[in-house]
Amino acid sequence: MQTSHSLPSAQLPLFQEAFWASNGAPLLDDVIDSPSSASIEEPAAFSELSLSGLPGHCLTLLAPILRELSEEQDARWLTLIAPPASLTHEWLRRAGLNRERILLLQAKDNAAALALSCEALRLGRSHTVVSWLEPLSRAARKQLSRAAQLGQAQSLNIRLG
């Protein structure tokens, strides 16, 4: 059974005033067309992907993304730093990734993984550095972004949960 809820007509003017009162605030079209929106079109150097569920399911969701990155036309490496233990060379093969274009690097802890990620990005020998860093502070995100910009690369952090 459906019930219809209608707003009392006395409330409608409150909403109309909020929507029609511009107070000099730019409309979305004005923001998109402004010169300062050019930075929106530039790809971000740092991205983060959060996947939750069973580890096997998360890797299944991640496989097409990694496959696409491994087949990138850019001749540089796809570097995977501190992946979960289940992401092995055998898993890469079964998932159909181009293993000839992938560097798989382990780190002893989160701090070492962050340092290794920044160095791999900064060197510019990888088109994309995929890391599994948790937790990742705002300062660490900025570090990864700066390193990616220096190396003209992309940083992708995967959070599994």
Swiss-Prot record:
Coiled coil location: none
Post-translational modification remark: Is rapidly cleaved and degraded by the Lon protease once DNA damage is repaired.
Keywords in alphabetical order: Cell cycle, Cell division, DNA damage, Septation, SOS response
Upregulating conditions: By DNA damage, as part of the SOS response.
SUPFAM superfamilies according to UniProt: P-loop containing nucleoside triphosphate hydrolases
Example GO biological process: negative regulation of cell division
Keyword DNA damage: yes
Positions of the UniProt region annotated as FtsZ binding: 99-104, 106-108, 120-125
Tagged with keyword Cell division: yes
Xref: InterPro entries: Cell_div_suppressor_SulA (IPR004596), P-loop_NTPase (IPR027417), SulA_CellDiv_inhibitor (IPR050356)
Pfam family, one: SulA
Function, as annotated: Component of the SOS system and an inhibitor of cell division. Accumulation of SulA causes rapid cessation of cell division and the appearance of long, non-septate filaments. In the presence of GTP, binds a polymerization-competent form of FtsZ in a 1:1 ratio, thus inhibiting FtsZ polymerization and therefore preventing it from participating in the assembly of the Z ring. This mechanism prevents the premature segregation of damaged DNA to daughter cells during cell division.
Subunit architecture: Homodimer. Interacts with FtsZ.
Family per record: Belongs to the SulA family.
Stored PANTHER family: BLR3025 PROTEIN-RELATED, CELL DIVISION INHIBITOR SULA
Name recorded for this polypeptide: Cell division inhibitor SulA
Gene name, Swiss-Prot/TrEMBL: sulA
